[in-house]
Amino acid sequence: MSFNDPFSILFGNGGDSRRNNANNDDPIILDVEADGDGPARNTNAGPSGSSRPPRGPANPRITRKPASGGSGGSRGSKILIGVVLALAIIVGLFFGLSRFITDLMWYGQLGFQSVVWTQLGVKIGLWVAYALLMALTGFVSAWLAIRARPDSADGSTIRINGDVVEVGKSVSSKTARRVAVVISLIVGVIFGSQFNANWSEILLMFNAQSFGTTDPQFGLDNGFYVFVLPGLKLVLAAVAMLLGVGLVFSVVTHVLMGGIRITMPVNGRGLFSITKRCRRQLGIWLMLNMFAWAVRQMIGVFDQLTVQGSRITGASYTAVHANIPVTFIMAALTAILGVVLGIWLMRSHTLEGQASIGVRASAALKAWRVPVTSIAVVVVVGLVLTVAWPVLLQRFRVNPNAQEMESTYIQRNIDATRAAYGLDKLKTEQYKVTDKGEQGALAKEGDTTAQIRLLDPQVVSPTFKQLQQSKQYYTFADTLAVDKYEIDGVSQDTVIAARELDLAGNDNRNWVNDHTVYTHGYGVVAAYGNKVTADGQPEFFESGIPTQGKLTESEKYEPRIYFSPNTTEYSIVGAPEGTQAWEFDYPTGSEGALTTFKGDGGPSVGNLFSRILYAIRFGSDQILFSDRVTSESQILYDRSPKERVAKVAPYLTLDGRVYPAVVDGRVKWIVDGYTTSDAYPYSQMTDLGSATKDSTTVSSATVSSLGSQKANYIRNSVKATVDAYDGSVDLYVWDQSDPVIKAWEKIFPGQYHQLSDISGDLMSHMRYPESLFKVQRELLSKYHVTSANQYYSGEDFWQTPVDPTESQSQQDQDILQPPYYLTLQTGGTKEPVFSLSSTYIPAGQSTREILTGFLSVDSDAGNEKGKIGSNYGTIRLQELPKDSNVPGPGQAQNNFNANADVSKELNLLQSGDTQVVRGNLLTLPLGGGLVYVQPVYVKSSGATSFPLLKKTLVAFGDQVGFADTLDEALDQVFGGDSGAAAGDAENVSGDQSGSDTNGGQSGTTDGKSDSGSSSDRSPELQQALNDAAQAMKDSQSAMKNGDWTAYGKAQQELEDALNKAIELDK
């Protein structure tokens, strides 16, 4: 056997000497082959008839004559082993494919199986296509190198006595081709798997849409940057990788085949040679790689329009006048360098034959002078143009005149940002405010005043749980939702929650109970947002089990909730007709009501094959053997609404909040979906996770931010609904002007419903999404200015205030105040509108926190089928005058805390075992200024305690009101009579227990608390009023002492006395 046979281990018998040792006396036959490719035959006769040796070295190939006789093992054993291996492979494949098959069943049941096949087809197609191209490129490169193999090459060298000696067996062309095929396929599969991960960019590139607007630098449609450019860069990167692999394969194969020969010097001599055919091939590969690099450099200039600068996103003066032209110059130099190096390599004859590397140093330097000089020139020029020139231009030309030089590009950034984030139609007005509360100031804003929300959805979840949870296996979200419903012909702000299943609360956990008995939650609970009961509890208009109230009067109402955010376990439901029901429906009597699922909510597990698949998926043999799994059974899983929408529309960014709504007699979960891009030219890049993080997302388990994603274009293009009973998903195109959703509609035809399919009832619950508003709020803190000079100076930049109701540690971390849903009347609206609102204070670290702006967006989509309300999505910004001193939220909270009377009463409230909980601090443009409203809750420290609304704080300017009701507190800051009645006005008692913190106004106002003089009352009526007054005093005393039993008794006595007084006063 020869020395240095690199492929003998893979394709020969000489790789392991132990295989050729004892116990095998077969004769060894030496088979001599010419040039390593075939048997040596003396067929080359010269003109005189004498034979001449074959071309190339005659190398011995060692082969072994097969031994005669039978094999050592039995044929039956081999067959058995083969069968076992085949079965193992089949079982392994079945287990591996079980998840894919069950996913197909899940998507098929929902009607979205095309999502799987489209993704899978594109991914596999890209993988296979790129793998084949990579393998073909590598093989062609190696095959060409093998064909260029020199006749005299024999493959290996060793050193003997200090001299280079040629010995050994050359690698045969056949063996080299085999190796090239194997390695090419391996490389192709590896790189193909990386390429298919970017399936969405490729699909969008081939389904590109026009934005109808062009970038200001190159004049190209913005659709080119959003759709075409990401895919084009991906394709160019793939081509560059192909050419790079081709070059590597060529070099390696030429080295193995002898086209490139190099050894280190020994005794002053060495061997270095590149054959002519090798040089030509390498020269071509080198030029192709340099051309690909040049093209990628040219395409890279478009990235300048989305590069993140120190001040703006997009090309600045230096980028436009230095970076962009230099990039074109460098691309040209790269291409020229590729031509120079390729031609030099193909024509450099000094690289042929043997050369004494150690002795002929000067000749070697001369041979390499052209490439070394060319590369050095390009590197030096590149450093000057790409580094020195932009730095010098920026420092000596731009910086001294920055405002003038950059104004054009800042203006581009302002215009593009406002367009990309939907801020170009912002309505701004100057809001001239007053900080003096005058009597009757709210008389013209009675509807808004009546709708001021008192229930804080972040605080009252424990109250909902305590009063409406019913059983421990139910729960409510820790942050409730705010919606609006028409009750008795009046639109009411509502705090609503679904009663979800919570298996963690069930003490009797086992497979049967977890997966076949406790399968669903039951009903929704809804309370008025603007009022509470006399004892501070939410005033429910939908509650109880079975559910009763204003929302469920329809006979078609379906209260069962099989799909909800808190439902994480799978359930097996359904049974043949006539089978005794075993699903627990709701508690009633001693046993509870039972039911059987009748919908189409999940894949069928009615046959053995599907049972086996799901038993593997969920690792449960109970699915195979339980009698609860029948021919009509369905398996419900992936039951979170957000998860279901994410699976059927993986290209959407989903809002961090999912909320329930009663729509046409069914409970629907509504999910907002966004289309985003990070390639909109000149638009400011935003970290969506940071922009949507606030005190709610930090403290809540059910509301989240958008995550760590950067984008500079966003649209709320999709509204999705998930039916709480059967889990069906419906996707509606909400923003029909968005080019991105148009592209996805082309990619997944038939997946979306159009706007005309939205019913009037569903339309009434479509609201403006929080996450989008928070992103826009973040951008408008700077981009409310429309002048480049004003933006450059930054003197009018704002910021969102931190949440002053949070702990000091949270405030130190700059946890922002969340926006709030409210029905209010702002500038430009004649009637109160359901809105989402927030505030601004000056940017920076100043301790003087004054209000600079009030931001709101119309969130009422109307109630007309297939038509969005005309004002929906209108963003309104009310800017306060520069000399205004209206306190910001933090300063208003400080005013509350610093008020002596407020502090005294709060201290009394939290004495003993009670605790005071501050609710959300609402800001409302009322009475010609800004009114702050904060509900104050009280709860005991017991394990079953829950907050009750006991007081309300109100601030207007520097005036503070603090009373049992919002109505009374408003009167305190508006001269004794605000002129309007709040939603809790009916809770105002004859005995004013609130404090007049302004020292000059009575908390009780004429006409609102007196029903007549005492002399006009009957003795019975007077006694009833006296009983009510005493009951109120008893209530206050019990509350201060933390005696909630006595408090409840006193409240009942108060209610009885008031009812009696009402009857007597008729």
Curated annotation (Swiss-Prot):
Region (Disordered): 12-74, 977-1044
Subcellular location: Cell membrane
Keyword Transcription regulation (UniProt): no
InterPro entries referenced in this protein's UniProt entry, alphabetically: UPF0182
Signal peptide annotation: none
Membrane topology, as annotated: Multi-pass membrane protein
GO cellular component terms listed in the entry, alphabetical order: extracellular region; plasma membrane
Parts of the chain that traverse the membrane: 77-97, 126-146, 179-199, 235-255, 282-302, 326-346, 372-392
Biased composition (Polar residues): 989-998
Top-level taxonomic group: Bacteria
UniProt KW keywords: Cell membrane, Membrane, Transmembrane, Transmembrane helix
Skewed-composition ranges (Low complexity): 44-61, 1003-1016
Family membership noted in the UniProt record: Belongs to the UPF0182 family.
PANTHER family: UPF0182 PROTEIN SLL1060
Protein name according to UniProt: UPF0182 protein BL1029
Gene source species: Bifidobacterium longum (strain NCC 2705)
